Amino acid sequence: MSNEFDYLFKLLLIGDSSVGKSCFLLRFADDSYVDSYISTIGVDFKIRTVEVEGKTVKLQIWDTAGQERFRTITSSYYRGAHGIIIVYDITDMESFNNVKQWLDEIDRYANDSVRKLLVGNKCDLAENRAVDTSVAQAYAQEVGIPFLETSAKESINVEEAFLAMSAAIKKSKAGSQAALERKPSNVVQMKGRPIQQEQQKSSRCCST
């Protein structure tokens, strides 16, 4: 791949607006937090390199706007993504209810092999919780994706979320490569008669 990194993974952050996607990314990429972070217009991305199981992984993380009017812009960015993190706000039930719509978009636009992770952000606001952890866990199990609760403000599980996603993608790629190496080559065995015999047979058929 490169002397600087072993893998390059494209990740997407999706979810409703105001669930904290930009702050979530800012915490991971720059280890900083801003209360008055300006809402993303369209898309933005940051890059960070991490170590995963002895390999250097370069992450290109796209922060997509959650507003409905931007979905036509962001749909093209699903293609080529290795991993997608779906973010909701634990204090906003509607953002959790809309997770299904975001998963439907992934099914529509992303590759079948894309890895997914469900993240309940703003877990530091437990007193305002609207989505029980057990409810989110049950839903994640139902749809077959991992789940974490995070806080960009308090830096809770943010690093873990991206590292878990990176490890899952790396494992998936390694499995695909191993399966490819085990797959027998598609060699077609063809049986035929010597050309001389075919020519002799052909000449007899044409003789009158």
Swiss-Prot record:
Molecular-function annotations in GO: GTP binding; GTPase activity
Lipid bilayer topology: Lipid-anchor
Lipid group attachment sites (S-geranylgeranyl cysteine): C205, C206
CC terms in the record's Gene Ontology section: endomembrane system; plasma membrane
A Pfam family assignment: Ras
Top-level taxon of the source organism: Eukaryota
Binding-site positions, GTP: 15-23, 33-40, 63-67, 121-124, 151-153
InterPro entries: P-loop_NTPase, Rab, Small_GTP-bd, Small_GTPase
Region ranges (Disordered): 189-208
Key words, A-Z: Cell membrane, GTP-binding, Lipoprotein, Membrane, Nucleotide-binding, Prenylation, Protein transport, Transport
Tissue spec: Low levels in coleoptiles.
Keyword Nucleotide-binding: yes
Gene Ontology terms: biological process: intracellular protein transport
Gene3D superfamilies: P-loop containing nucleotide triphosphate hydrolases
Residue positions of motif Effector region: 37-45
Recorded family membership: Belongs to the small GTPase superfamily. Rab family.
NCBIfam families in the record: small_GTP
PANTHER family attached to this UniProt entry: RAS-RELATED PROTEIN RAB
Protein name per UniProt: GTP-binding protein YPTM1
Lineage, uppermost ranks: Eukaryota, Viridiplantae, Streptophyta, Embryophyta, Tracheophyta
Gene, per the UniProt record: YPTM1
